[in-house]
Amino acid sequence: DRYIMRQKKLVYYGKKCLIFLISVFILSVAVFYVARLAPGDPLISYYGDRTEKMSPEEREWAMGKLGLNEPISVQYVKWVKNAFHGEFGISFKYKQDVVEVIGGRIGNTLVLGGIGFIIMFAGALLLGILCAWYENRLADRILCKLGTISSCIPEFWMALVLILVFSVNLKILPSSGAYSTGNAGDIGDRVLHLIMPLTIVVMEHLWYYAYMIRNKILEEVRADYVLLAKAKGLDKKKLMFRHCVRNVMPAYLSIMAIAVPHVLGGTYVVESVFSYPGIGALSYESARYHDYNLLMLLCMMSGILVIFCNIVSQTINEQIDPRMKDEVITEKSEVVEG
């Protein structure tokens, strides 16, 4: 039996790995062809104004130097081969290896997105539980109304309001950048620069997931076993936290796995508004200047993150939920009998 179970697990995870690899392959083809066939002249990004003065022969030589004069299928095969060796090409705009360019920016995005995700995850859970506990009472109504209003306000507009209030009028928070000039190592200065972008990232996603956890808890609260337990006089707090909240956590964890790329993607707009030197601003620049190598690697990183998180979420649903179902059935019978 153990051998059969191990074989089933190997087959199961093997299928997941195969799905991941096929998805990444399709993504790579789509990203490469869309980037290469997009309108624009990449030579302008690399050579600047000199491009206009080039003769046809010089343009041909320049295209050959950048590997852009070969058939697109040949370019794709070479790009994949180089990628397996960790070589993703040179940035046309920055004249550096694209890995080095991204490495200099990705830390800022991970800090902004990572801290934002943790705060949003914890805050949404607490707000969802609070709203479910005070269902249809004043606290629930106020929080739901505030959440609805907050969710309807565009990120960029909210960011501009914060800049106007706290930077222009009150002058207590910096309006742009990740740190002040010469203060790269000052943690306090970095925290001040992080406050407004972080606020926007959290507020943009917090209420959506708070509503979700509220509704899932209320679904559990209205389950037959909970109603019967209430009739038998079991403590409301014990029912809420030991059974209802616990039973919705697997579904919430799978949702949060999908939320990872969603939250990190939300930092792109925030970075542009606050001139925050992260991956979002870099993605915009790479698209604007037709920096193919940089743009393709950024798109691949984002796409792989989305694929990976979706597979993790699906795996959580398929692996945890069945076990939790058995556990829930046992708990329900204990609650009803007790």
Question: What spans do the regions from the language model cover?
Answer:
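N-terminal Sec/SRP start-transfer signal
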Residues: 1-19, 231-232
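An internal, D/E-rich "acidic patch" concept
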Residues: 5-9, 68-125
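Membrane-water interface segments at transmembrane-helix boundaries in multipass membrane proteins
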Residues: 145-207
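Short hydrophobic, aromatic-rich alpha-helical segments embedded in or entering the lipid bilayer
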Residues: 54-85, 194, 274-285
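Alpha-helical membrane-inserting segments
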Residues: 26, 30, 34, 123, ...
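Cytoplasmic-entry segments and transmembrane alpha-helices of multi-pass inner-membrane transporters
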Residues: 8-15, 126-162, 252
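Hydrophobic alpha-helical transmembrane segments of membrane transport/permease proteins
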Residues: 24-74, 170-189
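Alpha-helical transmembrane segments of integral membrane proteins
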Residues: 106-139, 155, 184-338
